[in-house]
Amino acid sequence: MRKVAVVIGSQTDLPQCKEGLTLLQNAVESGQIQLYLDSVFISSIHRATDDTLNQLADISKSEDVDILITGAGWANHLTGVCDAYLRYGLDDVRTRVIGVAFEDKDDQTHTQAAVASIVNVPGTQVIYQDDGGIFIGADGFTRACQFAISDELPAIKLPEARPQVRMSLADAIAKGG
């Protein structure tokens, strides 16, 4: 049975999650999936960084979470950090990450930034769309939940990690052109 975890960046995003969370609840009740710790985690990568990373470590250590649904608005760093930390920090090549960009109806530049922060990450393994398009807003979250319940999960293909490079200030200036 597939096991799903959910991490949302803010409680203010929950109204966009209601239909999708209801879909997950129905799937749990019908025995289609299990929800990790029977919980939805609300955790800001900016304001609760350690808590978020510790939760990801717990999810990874459980060794039975197949898919992590992440959702956040504005710049949505949550999704990319979850994917990068699982892959390169925890060496987790089992848990797939679905990213949802939540809408800001008052300022579409926030919505656009949330989308760009998911789809424009080089080497990302984040699942951010289905046949209906990119996972954006309430409809996108619902479709992401449906994908987590019933779609075939893609294999994770990691690009080669890039080691940190340390150089002198003079060398950095020289390499800068």
What are these regions (language model features)?
Residues G20-N26, L56-A57, A84-R87, V115-S117:
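Short, solvent-exposed amphipathic alpha-helical segments in soluble enzyme
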Residues K18, L53-A57, T142:
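Amphipathic, non-transmembrane alpha-helical secondary structure
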Residues T52-A101:
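Glycine-rich phosphate-binding loop
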Residues L37-S62, D107-V115:
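Glycine-rich oxoanion-binding loops at beta->alpha junctions
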Residues F41-I45, G71-A72, V100-F102, Q129-D130:
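Glycine- and other small-residue-rich loops at beta-strand/loop junctions that grip anionic moieties
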Residues Q11, P15, L90-D92, R96-G177:
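C-terminal binding/interaction regions
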Residues D13-K18, T49-T52, W74-C82, D107-T111:
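Short glycine/serine/threonine-rich phosphate/pyrophosphate-binding segments
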Residues M1-H46:
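Glycine-rich phosphate/diphosphate-binding loop of Rossmann-like nucleotide-binding domains
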